[in-house]
Each structure stands twice: as structure tokens, then as C-alpha cells.
């Protein structure tokens, strides 16, 4: 059998799967596989499932040989040395993808060596991450990767028995696949999903630094093998394959103007185009635009999504063959997407850049990325370079869209929207009922996003799509090519309000009518809550909470975090693992904390009452955007502030790195505040938090370290109870605020201390009401105590919790 590119990619994807078998059966006699090498087990794996591979048009014997014969240096086992061009292609891809193995060291029994987190070796501010490893099998019956599984432990659960459980899961997934009639690409991507589930938490190599998962290594090997095979036109000689040259293209795609595009919505009221639906749809459009550009390129060249080696947050990196066809596809894509952007007002600007490189350049991937980013910077200096002249003519004046203000409205009447904003509202309404995203080459179910060469629809099952995104980390086989990409986020609906308040639908309708919140759309459980409803569901003052968080030092982490004296450890596998793991946090972990907070009860130390409260309140939060390394959430302000504290704690547990922290801004705003203004204020708040040292949340006018904020939460709750019991009056509290604002900003230390006698005098009123309360608030006389330093934060927190306006 002469291999095609997809078959060679499959061999690359499976080449080290035998390591799972060898570790599960470590030290045991195995009559089926006498030499017990991982290469022998790889061949055994393929032959055990020969029917599955044969059903997809593959020769199992060819696949077994091509996948297992990838060790050129095994001179004492010639049966595993490459001979055919296909075998050499996989062997070379394995070598290029394994540069971290050259670091040496390591040891220990392979089944007992845990996978270290990708953050472990990041050197930031002179510090590396803490020791720890992943448990591939966890509490509650977890086997492999799922929400809550990527938290390092000091004593991870890893052993032969754990590998046996993983092997059972993998075998079970293949049995499920056998029930479908799978094409070759669907088989490749279903296998990739099964390997992602079972091999994401085990190391590729246990004899060197074990910080690259076996899944990440297999995926990258498949991508390199596919690109290398296509470079040679599908019929190379072994000699031509082994001769190095600029056979690869590394491509970066970047959507510019993301925040401006998402937040450029003129109408902020729910009645103007249904902003609660449209804002999430517009954010999703940005993510899907980048994905559509990447998938369109890969499809044109006959590659799979495995060749998207990095990507998140409107940016992607592709590994392509350096062929005339690939370069022509890149040029055509750049122009087609540029014209698409111009037609839509130019608020979202796609950029595409690439560099050619040799196989040996995988050795210094950091230098390769630097070249690529320089090319991208040059590309950004000349957007829409394909335009020779405008060539446009003025048309009849049209009313601008009432929502975006960029495109002409469909009708010349007040409040009329452009077709794109109308579609966003329809997509937003469809989001709660969708469990997948489909990419179509021709017609797609309406409403859909219309990108150059592709249409993208939401819902299920989306027949006719050539590629699907799953909305959850779901690894069960599907009949069509797909991957797990949780991009749809969370929209709070009426059903969540009913659960949080213990209401019936009739009670909810009566409440909405009394609050003046009823719209034209009749209430039903699937209806998306408006911003006004979310504000009214706050406990305390009816304001909308807004939270923007960003991962600190991530740019530094990717650029120089793996750099050491004389060498750079930033291999493509390490960077892919870092990107993928970070994406899991900002998509899956954030989403799961929103929708299923009880999962984190033990990890975050909640009691029953606290877990019950969070389970009712957190689903009311609205994810405008969460992915890459940042997020933007809205919702009832009290629930959102609690959520921010829990999420920051989870992030620390997730990274176990003292320099990997979160910074951001939190605001209370009226629900009618225009979205562009809200985004601007949040951006300024986030900048203030970072400017004052990072690892802070800016709220109520101050940037507060997270651990300090947890202590202030107790002060806020204590004051709230004192206000309710009338142990402290509001006048007393406003007096404290007045003294703080008068004296704290003073530059002279002595002058700042003048607040103390005035505060002591004011506190006499508290003593008259309650002696114990008075003793607690005497701490405010210590000017170094956080309770005084950040008094406006906890005082306003308590006042807003006790106020309805």
C-alpha cells in the first residue's frame, strides 16, 4: 500500500500509543507481545483493531508497520527501524517533535512517573513553578481528561493500575467507534479525541523532563508527518525525505481590533436588538472567524485540524507544507478575508503572516517564532495591502444601524438594524439550545455566520458539516470529523432565575412585570435574561456587575519563560501544551464553575450551605468572553464578586506558579450603560490593577491584592450584619468614608494620622449601641491594617449589599 497524507498522519498519531500498553503491563510477561517494547505494542494495538482501520479503507498491516518502525537508532532491533518512505516520514516527524528529549536526565519506573504541569519549568521573575504532577485517574470515577482534572497534586495518583484504567477507557472508545461507518478523516479525529482524553495527563517521555504529555507529542508528530508528506507530493524517496530543507511553513493568523469590534454596540438597552443575545453572539463570531480562517486553509490543502498546532483568543498557528499550492492558498485567503472585513466596516481586521523553515529549526522553535512574529508585525503595518485604490463610488445615504452604527440599517426607520446585527440576535437566541458548531462548505442551517468560503452554524446535529466543534470536553465518538472546542460559553436564562429564587414561571412573570422588565417576548424557561433582569437579581442594590480578568505575565511566559543560560527549552510540544492547558482553564474550568460549581466544593473548601448558594447563584452569570488568557463576565454584582474570588483561587491551584496570577477590574454599573463605555471603564480598571503590581482586583476605586480582598470580604459581611441589626448606623459608616477620603491621600505621614482622634470620637456612638462591635472597629485606628488601608472597598461592598434603589 502506498500511503496518502492522511494515512501517514494517522501513523504519526499512533506511533507511540504502545507506551500506554507497555506501562500498563510493566514487568509482566506478555505472550502476545514477547519483546514488550512500546513499538511492538503499537503494532499490536493496530492489529487488535484491524477491523476498525480496514473499515476506513486502511491496510492494518501497513499501518502497524508504518506506525511502529520509527526508531532509526535501534540497531539491535532492526524490525523497528524505518525502511519505506512512509516509515521514514513518521520517524523524522517523531524526531522533530521530540526535541525536549535531548535534555537528558530523568529516571524512575515509567508507570510511576507523573506528568508535570507545563507551568512547572516557566522561569518568571526568577521563580519556577512548584513541584507537583497530574493524576490521570481521580476521585468520583474520573478517568482521563475532564473538567477539574488538570490540577497538579503533590502526590499524584499514577501507577500501573492507573494505566490499566486508561487503557480500558481507550479500548472502550475504539469499540464505540466500531459501531459507526467512519471515513478516514473522521477516524483520525475520533482517535485524536480518544487520545486527548486518555493521554493528556501522562508523560510522553519518562526518562527526560516529563512535562510534555503523550497526547501533545502524538498530535504534533501527526501534524509534522502530514505536512512533510504533502511537501514531497505524496511520492518521495527515503533519501529525499531525509535531506533537510525549507519544507515547512509556520503560519500565524491574528484578528486585529477584537475588543473594539465586540464592544462597538451603540444601543445598550435590551430593547435595541436584544443586546444580551447579541453581545455573546458577537464575541463568538470573533472566535469563530479565526477558526474558520484556519480550517478553510487546512481544508484547501487536504490537512486536518491537527495541523493547527497552537491557537486561542482570535489567534492561530498552522503547520503547512512549503509548496506553491500552500503559498497561493495563503495569498488568496489573505485577500478574501481582507475584502470580507472591509465589507463589514473594517472593525475586525484579519492578519496573516508566514515563514519558511527547515526540519532542524524545530530545535530552536523560539527563534522561529520570533521570525514569525516579526513578519506579523510587518503585516500589521500594511493592512488590506491588496487594495490598489478604493475604486468605490458614493451611494445613496442610508440610516446607520441602531446597534453597531457601522453598516446601513435594513430599513430607513428609527431602531432599524443592519442584517449582521439581526443575525447576531438570532444566533444569540439559538446559543442556549446548541451543543455544537458546524462548518459548512455550501449551505448551512439558518441563522449562520457567512465567512469567506465557509458558513458556520450552531445547534445540533448539523448534518452536512465537514467539521464540527463540540461545546464541551466530550470525547465520545461522533460519525463526522470533530474536535472538543468549548467556545459557546454560558448565557443565563429564565430557568436559572427560577432555580435561584425558587419561583414558578408565573411568579417570575409577576416579578418581571412589577419591576418593569417585561419585554415583547413572552417569558419561557429558555429565554435569555436581559441585563436589566440580571441587575434586578442582585442581592442588594440592583446593579449589573462587570468583571474583566487577564492572566499576568503570559506574554513573557511564551516569549522567554523557557529560556535558560545558553539554551531555550521552548520546544513546539511545550508551547502547545502550555497553550492547550491555559485554554482548558479559561474555557472549560470557567464554564464549569459557572454551570456546575458543586464540582469544586472540596477543592475550594465550601460547606454545604455555601455550595448550595453558589449552585443557585453562579449560573446567573453571563460569559461575554472567556478564552485564551482572559475573560469578561457580567451578572448580578454580588454573585460575580464571589465568583471572582473563587476563580482566582482555582487559577492558583491550576498553575501552582507564584508568578502566574490574575489581574482585573470589577464594576457596579446601571444595566443601561452603553457597552463601549462599560468596556472602556473595565479596561482602565484592569490597567490600574496591573500598574499597582499585578495580582490585584481593582474595585470601588482601589486595586486590592487578592488575599487581602478575601480578608475584606469578612469585614464587609460583618458590617452588613451590624447595619441590619442597627449596631452601626449608616451615618457612622459614611463618617468613616469621609475621614478616609480626607486624610488617606495626604502625602505627609503625620498629617495622615490626624484621622485617628476623629475616628475614635466617632466610634463612641458604636460603643453606645454595642460594646463588642465597638471593639471590632477599634482596629481601624491601626493605619497599617488592611481594614483601614482599603476601607472604601469593604464599606461600599457592605452598603451595596444592604441597599435597594
UniProtKB/Swiss-Prot annotation:
<dbReference type="InterPro" id="IPR013408">
    <property type="entry name" value="Cas10/Csm1"/>
</dbReference>
<keyword id="KW-0378">Hydrolase</keyword>
<dbReference type="GO" id="GO:0051607">
    <property type="term" value="P:defense response to virus"/>
</dbReference>
<keyword id="KW-0547">Nucleotide-binding</keyword>
<keyword id="KW-0269">Exonuclease</keyword>
<comment type="function">
    <text>This subunit is a single-strand-specific deoxyribonuclease (ssDNase) which digests both linear and circular ssDNA; it has both exo- and endonuclease activity.</text>
</comment>
<keyword id="KW-0694">RNA-binding</keyword>
<dbReference type="InterPro" id="IPR052117">
    <property type="entry name" value="Cas10/Csm1_subtype-III-A"/>
</dbReference>
<comment type="subunit">
    <text>Probably part of the Csm effector complex, that includes Cas10, Csm2, Csm3, Csm4, Csm5 and mature crRNA.</text>
</comment>
<feature type="domain" description="GGDEF">
    <location>
        <begin position="542"/>
        <end position="702"/>
    </location>
</feature>
<dbReference type="Pfam" id="PF01966">
    <property type="entry name" value="HD"/>
</dbReference>
<keyword id="KW-0614">Plasmid</keyword>
<keyword id="KW-0051">Antiviral defense</keyword>
<feature type="region of interest" description="HD domain">
    <location>
        <begin position="1"/>
        <end position="99"/>
    </location>
</feature>
<comment type="function">
    <text>CRISPR (clustered regularly interspaced short palindromic repeat) is an adaptive immune system that provides protection against mobile genetic elements (viruses, transposable elements and conjugative plasmids). CRISPR clusters contain spacers, sequences complementary to antecedent mobile elements, and target invading nucleic acids. CRISPR clusters are transcribed and processed into CRISPR RNA (crRNA).</text>
</comment>
<comment type="similarity">
    <text>Belongs to the CRISPR-associated Cas10/Csm1 family.</text>
</comment>
<dbReference type="Pfam" id="PF18211">
    <property type="entry name" value="Csm1_B"/>
</dbReference>
<dbReference type="InterPro" id="IPR041062">
    <property type="entry name" value="Csm1_B"/>
</dbReference>
<keyword id="KW-0808">Transferase</keyword>
<protein>
    <recommendedName>
        <fullName>CRISPR system single-strand-specific deoxyribonuclease Cas10/Csm1 (subtype III-A)</fullName>
        <ecNumber>3.1.-.-</ecNumber>
        <ecNumber>2.7.7.-</ecNumber>
    </recommendedName>
</protein>
<keyword id="KW-0067">ATP-binding</keyword>
<dbReference type="InterPro" id="IPR043128">
    <property type="entry name" value="Rev_trsase/Diguanyl_cyclase"/>
</dbReference>
<dbReference type="GO" id="GO:0003723">
    <property type="term" value="F:RNA binding"/>
</dbReference>
<dbReference type="InterPro" id="IPR054767">
    <property type="entry name" value="Cas10-Cmr2_palm2"/>
</dbReference>
<dbReference type="GO" id="GO:0004519">
    <property type="term" value="F:endonuclease activity"/>
</dbReference>
<keyword id="KW-0540">Nuclease</keyword>
<dbReference type="InterPro" id="IPR000160">
    <property type="entry name" value="GGDEF_dom"/>
</dbReference>
<dbReference type="GO" id="GO:0016740">
    <property type="term" value="F:transferase activity"/>
</dbReference>
<feature type="region of interest" description="Disordered">
    <location>
        <begin position="99"/>
        <end position="119"/>
    </location>
</feature>
<dbReference type="Pfam" id="PF22335">
    <property type="entry name" value="Cas10-Cmr2_palm2"/>
</dbReference>
<dbReference type="GO" id="GO:0004527">
    <property type="term" value="F:exonuclease activity"/>
</dbReference>
<dbReference type="GO" id="GO:0005524">
    <property type="term" value="F:ATP binding"/>
</dbReference>
<dbReference type="InterPro" id="IPR006674">
    <property type="entry name" value="HD_domain"/>
</dbReference>
<keyword id="KW-0255">Endonuclease</keyword>
Amino acid at each position: 500500500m502506498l500511503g496518502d497524507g492522511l494515512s501517514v498522519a494517522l501513523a504519526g498519531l499512533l506511533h507511540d500509543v504502545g507506551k500506554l500498553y507497555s506501562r500498563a503491563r510493566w514487568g509482566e510477561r506478555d505472550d502476545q507481545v514477547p519483546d514488550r517494547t512500546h513499538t511492538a505494542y503499537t503494532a499490536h494495538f493496530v492489529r487488535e483493531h484491524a477491523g476498525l482501520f480496514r473499515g476506513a479503507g486502511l491496510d492494518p498491516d501497513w499501518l502497524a508497520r508504518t506506525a511502529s518502525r520509527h526508531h532509526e537508532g535501534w540497531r539491535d532491533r532492526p524490525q523497528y527501524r524505518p525502511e519505506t518512505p512512509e516509515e521514514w516520514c513518521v520517524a523524522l516527524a517523531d524526531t522533530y517533535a521530540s526535541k525536549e528529549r535531548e535534555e537528558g536526565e530523568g529516571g524512575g519506573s515509567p508507570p510511576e512517573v507523573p506528568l508535570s504541569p507545563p507551568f512547572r519549568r516557566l522561569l518568571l521573575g526568577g521563580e519556577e513553578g512548584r513541584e507537583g504532577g497530574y493524576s490521570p485517574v481521580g476521585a468520583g470515577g474520573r478517568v482521563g481528561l475532564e473538567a477539574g482534572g488538570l490540577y497538579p497534586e503533590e502526590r499524584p495518583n499514577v501507577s500501573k493500575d492507573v494505566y490499566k484504567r486508561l487503557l480500558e477507557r481507550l479500548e472502550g472508545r475504539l469499540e464505540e467507534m466500531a459501531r459507526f461507518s467512519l471515513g478516514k478523516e473522521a477516524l483520525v479525529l475520533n482517535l485524536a479525541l480518544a487520545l486527548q482524553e486518555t493521554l493528556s495527563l501522562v508523560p510522553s517521555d519518562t526518562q527526560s523532563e516529563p512535562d510534555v504529555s503523550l497526547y501533545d507529542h502524538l498530535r504534533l508528530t501527526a501534524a509534522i508527518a502530514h505536512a512533510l508528506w504533502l511537501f514531497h507530493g505524496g511520492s518521495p524517496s527515503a533519501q529525499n525525505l531525509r535531506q533537510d530543507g525549507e519544507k515547512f511553513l509556520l503560519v500565524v493568523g491574528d484578528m486585529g481590533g477584537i475588543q473594539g469590534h465586540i464592544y462597538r454596540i451603540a444601543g445598550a438597552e435590551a430593547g435595541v436588538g436584544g443586546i444580551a443575545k447579541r453581545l455573546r453572539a458577537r464575541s463568538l463570531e470573533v472566535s469563530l472567524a479565526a477558526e474558520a480562517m484556519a480550517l478553510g486553509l487546512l481544508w484547501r490543502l487536504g490537512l486536518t485540524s491537527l495541523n493547527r498546532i497552537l491557537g486561542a483568543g482570535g489567534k492561530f498557528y498552522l503547520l503547512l507544507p512549503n509548496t506553491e499550492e500552500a503559498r497561493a492558498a495563503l495569498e488568496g485567503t489573505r485577500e478574501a478575508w481582507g475584502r470580507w472585513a472591509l465589507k463589514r466596516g473594517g472593525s475586525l481586521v484579519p492578519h496573516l503572516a508566514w515563514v519558511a523553515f527547515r526540519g532542524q529549526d524545530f530545535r530552536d522553535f523560539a527563534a522561529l517564532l520570533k521570525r514569525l512574529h516579526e513578519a506579523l508585525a510587518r503585516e500589521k503595518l500594511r493592512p488590506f495591502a491588496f487594495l490598489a485604490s478604493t475604486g468605490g463610488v458614493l451611494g445613496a445615504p442610508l440610516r446607520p444601524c441602531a446597534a453597531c452604527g457601522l453598516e446601513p440599517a435594513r430599513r430607513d426607520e428609527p431602531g432599524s438594524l443592519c442584517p449582521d446585527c439581526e443575525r447576531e440576535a438570532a444566533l444569540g437566541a439559538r446559543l442556549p439550545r446548541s451543543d455544537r458548531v458546524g462548518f459548512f462548505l455550501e449551505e448551512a442551517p439558518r441563522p449562520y455566520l457567512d465567512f469567506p468560503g465557509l458558513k458556520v452554524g450552531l445547534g445540533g446535529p448539523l448534518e452536512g458539516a465537514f467539521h464540527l466543534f463540540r461545546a464541551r470536553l466530550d470525547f465520545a465518538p461522533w460519525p463526522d470529523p470533530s474536535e472538543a472546542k468549548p467556545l459557546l460559553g454560558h448565557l443565563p436564562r429564565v430557568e436559572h432565575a427560577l432555580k435561584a429564587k425558587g419561583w414558578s414561571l408565573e411568579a417570575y412573570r409577576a416579578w418581571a412585570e412589577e419591576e418593569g422588565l417585561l419585554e415583547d417576548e413572552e417569558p419561557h424557561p429558555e429565554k435569555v435574561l436581559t441585563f436589566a433582569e440580571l441587575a434586578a437579581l442582585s442581592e442588594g442594590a440592583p446593579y449589573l456587575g462587570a468583571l474583566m480578568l487577564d492572566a499576568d505575565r503570559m506574554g513573557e511566559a511564551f516569549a522567554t519563560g523557557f529560556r535558560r543560560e545558553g539554551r531555550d527549552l521552548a520546544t513546539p510540544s511545550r508551547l502547545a501544551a502550555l497553550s492547550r492547558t491555559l485554554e482548558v482553564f479559561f474555557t472549560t474550568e470557567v464554564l464549569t464553575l459557572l454551570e456546575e460549581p458543586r464540582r469544586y466544593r472540596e477543592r475550594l473548601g465550601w460547606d454545604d450551605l455555601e455550595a448550595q448558594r453558589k449552585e443557585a447563584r453562579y449560573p446567573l452569570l453571563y460569559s461575554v468572553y472567556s478564552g485564551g488568557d482572559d475573560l469578561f463576565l457580567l451578572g448580578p454584582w454580588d454573585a460575580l464578586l464571589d465568583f471572582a474570588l473563587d476563580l482566582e483561587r482555582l487559577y492558583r491551584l491550576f498553575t501552582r506558579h507564584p508568578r502566574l496570577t490574575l489581574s482585573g477590574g470589577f464594576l457596579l454599573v446601571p444595566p443601561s450603560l452603553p457597552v463601549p463605555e462599560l468596556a472602556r471603564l473595565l479596561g482602565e480598571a484592569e490597567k490600574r490593577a496591573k500598574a499597582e503590581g499585578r495580582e490585584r482586583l481593582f474595585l470601588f476605586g482601589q486595586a486590592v491584592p487578592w488575599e487581602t480582598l478575601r480578608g475584606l470580604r469578612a469585614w464587609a459581611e460583618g458590617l452588613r450584619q451590624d447595619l441590619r441589626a442597627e449596631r452601626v448606623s449608616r451615618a457612622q459608616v459614611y463618617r468613616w468614608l469621609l475621614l478616609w477620603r480626607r486624610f488617606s491621600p495626604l502625602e505627609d505621614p503625620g498629617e495622615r494620622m490626624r484621622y485617628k482622634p476623629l475616628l475614635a470620637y466617632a466610634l463612641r456612638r458604636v460603643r453606645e449601641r454595642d460594646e463588642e462591635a465597638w471593639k471590632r472597629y477599634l482596629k481601624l485606628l491601626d493605619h497599617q491594617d488592611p481594614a483601614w488601608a482599603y476601607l472604601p472597598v469593604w464599606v461600599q461592598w457592605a452598603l451595596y449589599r444592604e441597599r435597594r434603589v
